[in-house]
Curated annotation (Swiss-Prot):
Organism: Lymantria dispar (Gypsy moth)
One function term, GO molecular function aspect: structural constituent of egg chorion
Name of the featured protein: Chorion class A proteins Ld24
Cellular component aspect of the GO annotation: egg chorion
Pfam families per the UniProt record, alphabetical: Chorion_1 (PF01723)
Family: Belongs to the chorion protein family.
Amino acid sequence: IQACLVQSVFSQCTSRAAIAADRGIIGGYGLGAPCGLGYGLEAPYGWAGYADYGYPAGAYGIDAYGGIGEGNVAVAGELPVAGTTAVAGQVPIMGAVKFGGDVCAAGSVSIAGKCACGCGEGYGYGLGSPYLY
């Protein structure tokens, strides 16, 4: 179920080669490129720059999944998950997340970004910016 959820959300496969390739996420035109995170979060061309997500980022492979619509995910029973799940891109969530019953988990979760409600407020974790990337 988790694999189907990640595949349907991102509609693409991000391999190690795609991440480290010359034009991948950390390659010559990726996050560490001159117009990406390499110049800092609040630099003129960083993620907090022009369009909040880097002015030229969409043209070089940093883009949302592009899906539209609304969906519900229901899980009944046990869902054993082991290993590491790496997600690159944006996860647009608008609405509420609700859990019923006991949810036992071990490990760590890191969530960064800004809300999708349109208020323009970030999570406020510092770094000189209301956004944490």
